Regions:
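Terminal substrate-recognition subdomain of acyl/acetyltransferases
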Residues: 147-154
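Conserved active-site alpha-helix within GNAT-family acetyltransferase domains
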Residues: 96, 117-134, 140-144
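Acetyl-CoA-dependent GNAT
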Residues: 9-88, 99-101, 105
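Active-site acidic-Proline motif in GNAT/NAT acetyltransferases
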Residues: 86-88, 92, 116-117
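Conserved N-terminal entry element of GNAT/NAT acetyltransferase domains
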Residues: 1-13, 154
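Conserved GNAT acetyl-CoA-binding A-motif
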Residues: 105-117
Length: 154
């Protein structure tokens, strides 16, 4: 069932729900990794990114008002650090709404890193016009990643 989403700027009150959502999303995507153990890292990482100028935008499920997902984008560099959508909202438009917000904040282009073994995410970004620019390795997990980039149409 499709939902409608409202994208709002991050507020500190969102943080506990966003951390829960991030853990649940990644636990579903890569169950072999203990993302609950990475929760403290996420909280510190978000604070660090915000201190460096990045912004978090939150997709709220319009009927319920609960966070359905979030995106962290640095409008100065165009680097998208996090995109997470609760599994209950996969395929309902939350990720697209969040990416539209990111593209609005970084209209010159966006770069991101995605795990090569996350075909759902790779296909999603390709559907939005992202292309693979290079290969690398995630410094935390050691997993192979793609650097993907989006540029607006000329």
């Amino acid at each position: 069932m499709a939902s409608s989403f409202i994208v709002v700027p991050f507020a500190p009150a969102h943080l506990p729900a966003l951390a829960d959502l991030w853990v649940a999303t990644w636990a579903r995507t890569m169950p072999e990794i203990d993302f609950e153990a990475r929760r403290p890292w996420l909280l510190e990482h978000i604070a660090k990114l915000h201190g460096q100028g990045a912004e978090t935008h939150v997709a709220l499920d319009a009927p319920a008002g609960a966070p359905a997902g979030f995106v962290i984008i640095d409008p100065n560099t165009g680097y998208l650090d996090q995109l997470a959508v609760a599994p209950a909202h996969w395929g309902q438009g939350a990720a697209e709404a969040l990416m539209a917000a990111a593209q609005h904040r970084a209209p010159a282009g966006i770069a991101l890193d995605v795990n090569q073994d996350n075909p759902r995410a790779v296909a999603f970004y390709q559907k939005l016009g992202f292309t693979i620019a290079s290969a690398g390795q995630n410094p935390m997990s050691g997993r192979a990643i793609w650097r993907m980039e989006w540029r607006p149409a000329a």
